[in-house]
Amino acid sequence: MKANELREKSVEELNTELLGLLREQFNLRMQAASGQLQQTHMVKQVRHNIARVKTLLTQKAGA
């Protein structure tokens, strides 16, 4: 997800997005641990998206 798309979302929407990303990260880690993960690059992408959302939440909390 692009940072511009995330900036347009409200705090509630960002929290929902964060929960979804954390669930996805958990599922990817479980797949990696069991050897079923085909697209290993997804772990890094999800981690970066989580960081983007958390950064925006921090910025919106300060503003």
Curated annotation (Swiss-Prot):
GO molecular function: structural constituent of ribosome
SUPFAM superfamilies documented for this protein: Ribosomal protein L29 (L29p)
GO terms, biological process: translation
Keywords per UniProt: Ribonucleoprotein, Ribosomal protein
Superkingdom as given in the UniProt entry: Bacteria
GO terms for cellular component: cytosolic large ribosomal subunit
InterPro entries according to UniProt: Ribosomal_protein_uL29, Ribosomal_uL29, Ribosomal_uL29_CS, Ribosomal_uL29_sf
Family per similarity comment: Belongs to the universal ribosomal protein uL29 family.
Full protein name: Large ribosomal subunit protein uL29
Organism for this UniProt entry: Pectobacterium atrosepticum (strain SCRI 1043 / ATCC BAA-672) (Erwinia carotovora subsp. atroseptica)
Gene that produces this protein: rpmC
